[in-house]
Structures are given as C-alpha cells and as structure tokens.
C-alpha cells in the first residue's frame, strides 16, 4: 500500500449487481486490505440498468434497498445471517441451505455505508439507514431543499445530522477559463439528464427539473434521445 491515512471509497456498488452477501464479502476484504479505511457506497440504480444489464426487476426500490442494507450490516457484524424479507430469504426455506457467517474478518464490524439517492423518498431513507449521502449535481443554493428529507429520515430514528457525511460528486476540470471548462462538463451532465433512464423515469432529469431547470431538462432529454448528443450537451445551462 502506498497510503496510510486516506480513506478508500467504493463510489457506488449497484445493488442489483451483487447479492448482499457478495457485497459484504467484497466490503470486508477491501476494509481488511486498507487497514480499516474502506467506505461502502451503494445505489439501487435505475430500471434500464437493473433490468437490462443485471436482469433484476426494478420493483419497490426503497424496500429492496432497506433489506439489502440490513443484510449487509448483519453480515459485516459476522452474525449468522438469517433473514426473512420480501426480496431476500436467507437461507431459502425449502432447501439444504443454512445460516452462515462471514469468514473474512473485517477490521471493523461497522463499516460506514453511503447511499446514492436523488428522489425525496430515497433521500429520507438515506437519512434513516445510512451513514452518509453520495450526492450528484449538488448545489449549495439547493442544499436546504435536498437536505430536508435526509433530516426527516434521521429524525425517524432519533438521530441528528451530527456524524452524517454529505459527499457531493463534483467533476473537476483544471483551467482558468470557467466557461471553457464548463464546456467539457456539459456532455457528462447531458448523459445523465438525457440518457440515464427512459423518458418517463429518469431520476437525474427529474432532479434537474426540481432545481429549476425544467425546460432545459426537457430539451436535453429530447435532443439526447434523438441522438443529437452535441445539441443535448449545448442545452445544459451554464448555471447548472
């Protein structure tokens, strides 16, 4: 290892891409290799990726996320995993499976878990069950509205915001000309706002609309879905 103090983040492990047990095994291994410096980021993804890439139905994403985090935490505490949920039953009730314990010994039995959340209900869930939030397109001007459901989620479990991490995802372009640098970020924003999801269900597009750029969000999506990628990028407002 070349570092000793900097933490290692997972960015976003897609929940439909790994079983909870596989996720816990991966997290425990990375925590061990880093000497207790790993931070686990999770996200439920969206219907196109979940169903088109992973073959997992995108139904009840909030309930699925809750169960997933429950099981991951249980496994990382090295408890015998026995879970009777809507999406996961461990062990399966009609076969030879039995409750098992994680064989890897993580440095800590309570790894920090971050959720990538966008919608108000997912943000509230994040505040309730996670240790931090992985934010995209975070704006200080919109922080109060975005944080409100997280604060509500914390309150549901009698917790304050103390110790809760807010981690904005910020694309960085070095340079002295701000507008020229923004041109390099526009295609990145257009990909998410215009192409990540369907016309009816694109969480990034909905976020852009909630931030006050509804007409721009429509234009970016229209152009992107028409394969006018350059036009979609150009339609992303500089202020966004």
What positions do the PLM features span?
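Active-site-adjacent structural elements that line small-molecule/cofactor binding pockets in enzymes
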Residues: 1-240
């Amino acid at each position: 290892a070349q570092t000793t103090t900097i933490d290692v983040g997972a960015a976003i492990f897609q929940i439909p891409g790994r079983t909870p047990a596989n996720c816990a095994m991966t997290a425990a291994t990375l925590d061990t290799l880093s000497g207790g410096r790993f931070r686990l980021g999770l996200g439920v993804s969206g219907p196109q990726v979940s169903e088109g890439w992973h073959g997992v139905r995108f139904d009840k994403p909030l309930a699925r996320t809750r169960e997933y985090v429950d099981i991951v935490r249980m496994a990382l505490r090295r408890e015998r995993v026995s879970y009777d949920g809507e999406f996961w039953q461990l062990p399966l009730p009609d076969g030879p499976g039995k409750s098992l314990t994680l064989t890897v010994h993580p440095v800590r039995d309570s790894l920090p878990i971050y959720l990538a959340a966008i919608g108000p209900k997912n943000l509230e869930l994040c505040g309730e069950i996670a240790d931090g939030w992985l934010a995209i397109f975070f704006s200080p001007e919109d922080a109060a509205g975005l944080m409100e459901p997280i604060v509500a989620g914390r309150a549901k479990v009698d917790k304050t915001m103390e110790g809760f991490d807010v981690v904005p995802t910020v694309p960085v372009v070095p340079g002295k000309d701000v507008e020229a640098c923004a041109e390099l970020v526009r295609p990145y924003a257009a990909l998410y706002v215009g192409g990540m999801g369907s016309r009816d269900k694109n969480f990034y597009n909905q976020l852009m609309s909630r931030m006050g750029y509804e007409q721009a969000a429509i234009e970016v999506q229209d152009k992107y879905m028409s394969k006018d990628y350059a036009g979609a990028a150009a339609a992303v407002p500089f202020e966004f």
